[in-house]
């Protein structure tokens, strides 16, 4: 990752401005001389510039304390779904079944829908949006737009969004999930046109240089509010403030918009759209490479925590930020407002922890003053734990209630350090959808990740990583996963050039050859980014996209997801949706589906030839 000189300068100012350890002289960001240094030549302050005094009245970013409920705040994972999530699922089941019936009827798939959809044992779909910055967000947005029945009959897959129970995201995918969740699940066109403002840089959101300076000063002040309230802060807080202006609220910046407040949104209370989940990876102090078996944390509007062995517990999202000892608050006070939506999305997409390992060699090789300064800055971030999201540990002193033989890896630490949800190479957030408590039958995996070895196009590596994690952990705590080939096979067989189904036969998965039941691993439908209407292989670190580019990427993803609005492919999608339900109920697979599976399911072949180059060309005209 390359830091712009402007971005580096502002990052360098953040640390002394917050009073944090630094090798840089103290700098007062409000000093008139500093403002003079930043003032562009021959540019006067515009009359309509927003005064700093008005910006200072923005809602507080600082967490605050409230009285705690009695008893332990931690819920063991062995309890199953939280009460709040279960209530949401119960409200949504009938809506999902109704949407599925409409979609299946529209496709013309000949099955007895009443038998398949007549109870809570009907198909349960989860949609997973990959990481990869704004390009991944836009790829996911294109797929979601194609899946949205609110767009009428303009796409062949309209209704899939309404048929889904869960929506997960990590890194750039978390930006999409978080943005739709806090904006009352507005449609993609509205978000693109009226919220995201991607034609302005993430690091320079306004046309006027003074406005950009003032917004940075506002962000500094907001993060200082949090620090002065007694909480650890890091560069992730500033990152989250920048993201929130793009993704949460372009007018106020969402300084006090929390993820738990999603429960107050009309769509959530009515169960109208899928349950949102954002994930981040835990990093233990001293780790420079994140292992594949790291602890994966979930953020939902209901709670924060993990199903993973050793911790296996959750705290209510509204009280995230409360430091607990053995599940009990230290001073009988609970923290509120810590779960800032921008901060959570910033945590899930925190790439700063990857900067030092990725750039150390190249910076060291070029022995010049600027590179040495950058390297020194990055080392400082790592040494002082300022390159991670810092969360007061609710698990300190907590013995795992469901498995006392397993050590809680977070037990000694007062602070949990969280980083980009794809840091363990699992670039698609499958993990929350594999836990048996959620009963997910099929996962639609939207892959907009940038892979440098394949000219920026997906190569299936994210599926491979999750498959390897499941094998390495012996499926501990999860239902298993379909068999996945190596990335060379993806390229050689073209599995990354179109939607590909994995696990079509529920008896042939990592769970073994067993009768298909509620514990059978889900079928995975893989939707890779591909150049149907344009070259959408934009680098992860792109922070500004012209409207024509961003809208074009959304359109390209929609065309790729629908296979250019193919009615025959829509039938095959319907087959994937109902397959596990048919298998569980011992119902025969329709002949239409047999033909679909022959075309789209990976048949187990492993490529023997090595692919050395991969550079696809634009495929078709627009819809």
Curated annotation (Swiss-Prot):
It catalyses: a 1-acyl-sn-glycero-3-phosphocholine + H2O = sn-glycerol 3-phosphocholine + a fatty acid + H(+). Keywords: Glycoprotein, Hydrolase, Lipid degradation, Lipid metabolism, Secreted, Signal. Residues 1-19 form the signal peptide. Its EC number is 3.1.1.5. Residues 67-607 form the PLA2c domain. Pfam families: PLA2_B. Disulfide bonds: none annotated. One of its GO terms (biological process) is glycerophospholipid catabolic process. GO terms for molecular function: lysophospholipase activity; phospholipase A2 activity. It is an enzyme of class 3 (hydrolase). It is found in: Secreted. One of its GO terms (cellular component) is external side of plasma membrane. This is Probable lysophospholipase 5. It comes from Schizosaccharomyces pombe (strain 972 / ATCC 24843) (Fission yeast). The lineage of its organism: Eukaryota, Fungi, Dikarya, Ascomycota, Taphrinomycotina.
